[in-house]
């Protein structure tokens, strides 16, 4: 599914250069083709998920369509305040894409589990 997402996103960015993928230090090799062909459309925000959401809302205000991609539990649980206050309350259009729901990242320990999603 991740490979399909990356291929589909590549096609979308090719048609619409206002789409920007923000990653929280995950999936870097998955998006090599995007980084190579559209370097301005990929941003690795590091392990700073709340900052990624705030950055994305700023981009949305400037007519970009940011897509935030990271492990589900970090995307939601670490960033809930920014999602609510920056994106939802201010009606900023951002897209959240979580990967590794449930116990998909079981080998990384309980901090990476997302059993409440």
Where are the model-predicted features located?
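Thiamine diphosphate
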Residues: 1-117
């Amino acid at each position: 599914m991740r490979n399909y997402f990356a291929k589909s996103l590549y096609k979308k960015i090719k048609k619409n250069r206002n789409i920007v993928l923000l990653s929280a230090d995950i999936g870097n090799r998955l998006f090599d083709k995007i980084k190579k062909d559209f370097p301005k459309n990929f941003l690795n925000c590091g392990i700073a998920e709340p900052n990624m959401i705030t950055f994305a809302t700023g981009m949305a205000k400037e007519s970009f369509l940011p897509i935030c991609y990271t492990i589900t539990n970090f995307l939601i649980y670490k960033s809930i305040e920014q999602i609510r206050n920056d994106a939802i309350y201010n009606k900023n259009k951002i897209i959240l894409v979580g990967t590794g729901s449930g116990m998909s990242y079981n080998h990384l320990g309980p901090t990476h589990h997302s059993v409440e999603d």
